[in-house]
Design a protein with these regions (language model features):
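N-terminal export/membrane-targeting signals
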Residues: 1-22
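Glycoside hydrolase catalytic-domain context in secreted enzymes
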Residues: 21-234
Length: 234
């Protein structure tokens, strides 16, 4: 029990490493957004106004993710998924691959839904998108955070070019039991190593500081550290 609690403490500390690194970046232009009427607002103000306009059903809809199996080839407007997006009942998709398919779905969200909120399109980009790198467990053996960051950068560039804007990575579960079946996705059994390598991968995906326009560049995607604490072999 003591070992598990200690591992959890270091795991949580490791997952907070990326924001800590972010504070070393030089100040950059703040993120803004453009309304449908062409007005440019600070991102926080834009989001506050958008949230105020949303119905409860639309807020719930933002929590719904479609999976790739729900999407048929062509004719997105004619599917139930297309209807759900247009009605604001769908916030994003998971493991949908193909730029034309994603573009068609995004056009429904932006042009046909009441508020024009774009979809979040996520995928398990674990160790590369088109270019395949060694698995995270192997990469972590190098203790090379710059190499890990580069993997994130290349993965983000390739995935974003295909319409992906969100990855379910890095995985920072601490692998203390070899019987657990997902050890290859993580950085091994050392909590400190898992933290610094996970932070480096996150920087590669997102850039250094999400509070600036860097995250909006075409070659960036959002990271999502996983999984829930105590899910892995701890």
């Amino acid at each position: 029990m003591r070992t598990a609690l200690l591992s959890l403490t270091f795991l949580l500390a490791g997952t907070m490493a990326a924001p800590a690194f972010a504070h070393t970046a030089a100040p950059k232009k703040k993120v803004t957004a453009t309304t449908k009427k062409g007005k440019i607002l600070p991102m926080k103000e834009y989001i506050d106004q958008l949230m105020a306009k949303m119905t409860l059903q639309e807020k719930i809809g933002q929590l719904n993710l479609m999976v790739a199996g729900d999407i048929t080839t062509g004719g997105a407007l004619d599917t139930q998924v297309g209807s759900d997006i247009a009605q604001g009942n769908m916030g994003g998709g998971f493991n949908i691959k193909g730029l034309n398919k994603i573009k068609a779905l995004q056009e429904i969200a932006i042009k046909n839904s009441r508020l024009g909120i774009p979809l979040l399109v996520g995928m398990d980009v674990i160790h590369g998108y088109e270019t395949m790198f060694p698995i995270p467990l192997a990469l972590s053996c190098s203790w090379d955070t710059e190499a890990m960051k580069k993997v994130g950068e290349v993965s983000a560039k390739e995935a974003s070019a295909d319409g992906i804007n969100w990855t379910f990575s890095p995985m920072v579960d601490i692998a203390l039991d070899a019987r657990w079946g997902r050890i290859s996705e993580g950085n091994g059994e050392d909590p400190y190593l898992s933290g610094v390598m996970g932070a480096a991968m996150t920087q590669g995906y997102q850039g250094v500081d999400m509070r600036t326009e860097e995250i909006l560049r075409a070659n960036r995607i959002m990271a999502c550290l996983k999984h829930f604490a105590l899910y892995g072999g701890v």
